[in-house]
Regions:
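Juxtamembrane regions of bacterial inner-membrane/periplasmic proteins
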Residues: 1-199
Length: 199
C-alpha cells in the first residue's frame, strides 16, 4: 500500500514536470537534425528505442560493483534516467537515489512516448555556463558556442555539443580544450563507423 502511494507521488511529480513546455527556444522532434539525434544516441544510449527507460543489465552491474567492489555509483544511466536526474533530482550519488531514478524513468516511459522524452532531453540538457546563466538544450548551446541556428551546424560542431553532454565543466572548451578535442574526435569516430554500416 505504501509503495503504491509512493508510486502515485512520483507519477504526480513527473506529470507536473513534463506535461508542459517551459522553454521558449524548444524545437519539435521533427525540427531536430537527424544526424545530431543519431550521434547523441550512438554515444549516450544506443538502446534508447528498445529499453523501457532502464538498462537492467547495466543497473545490476553498477549495483554489484558498488556493493562488492566498493566502486562509485557511476554509469548505467539511460537518456530517460539522465532526463529525470537533470530535471527532478539532486547530484547525490547513493543507491537510494539510483533506485528512485530508475523507478521514475520507468514511470516516465509509461506516461510519455520515446520521441517526447528524447526531444525534452535535447531541449533541456545542460551544456555549459555563461556567468550565472546555464546553457540548456542544443538550440541555446548552438547559439552560445557558434552563433548560428542548430540546422546549420556541421558534423564537427554537432560532435562538440554531443561531447559536452558527458560533462560541460570537465570538457570545458577553453579550460580543457585538448580534453574536449579528444572527446569530440571519439564522438565523430563512433558516428562515422555507424554511417559506413548504414551505407
Amino acid at each position: 500500500m505504501i509503495f503504491v502511494v509512493y508510486l502515485n507521488h512520483l507519477s504526480q511529480l513527473l506529470y507536473d514536470a513534463f506535461s508542459y513546455n517551459t522553454s521558449t527556444n524548444a524545437l519539435s522532434f521533427e525540427q531536430q537534425p537527424k544526424s545530431m539525434i543519431n550521434m547523441l544516441l550512438l554515444v549516450e544510449d544506443q538502446s534508447f528505442f528498445k529499453h523501457p527507460g532502464v538498462d537492467f543489465k547495466e543497473i545490476i552491474r553498477v549495483v554489484r560493483d558498488y556493493i562488492f567492489y566498493d566502486k562509485p555509483l557511476r554509469g548505467a544511466s539511460t537518456i530517460t534516467m539522465q532526463l529525470i536526474k537533470n530535471t527532478l533530482l539532486n547530484r547525490e550519488r547513493s543507491l537510494g537515489r539510483k533506485v528512485k531514478e530508475a523507478l521514475m524513468a520507468l514511470l516516465l516511459e509509461h506516461s510519455f512516448d520515446k520521441k517526447f522524452i528524447l526531444n525534452r532531453y535535447i531541449n533541456t540538457v545542460y551544456l555549459g555556463q555563461k556567468g550565472n546563466i546555464s546553457i540548456n538544450g542544443f538550440t541555446n548551446a548552438t547559439r552560445f558556442y557558434f552563433n548560428k541556428k542548430l540546422a546549420l551546424l556541421s558534423l564537427e560542431e554537432m560532435a562538440m555539443l554531443v561531447a559536452l553532454v558527458k560533462g560541460p565543466d570537465y570538457y570545458h572548451p577553453v579550460r580543457h580544450s585538448l580534453r574536449l578535442l579528444k572527446r569530440k574526435q571519439l564522438v565523430l569516430s563512433i558516428y562515422q563507423k555507424f554511417e559506413k554500416i548504414v551505407k
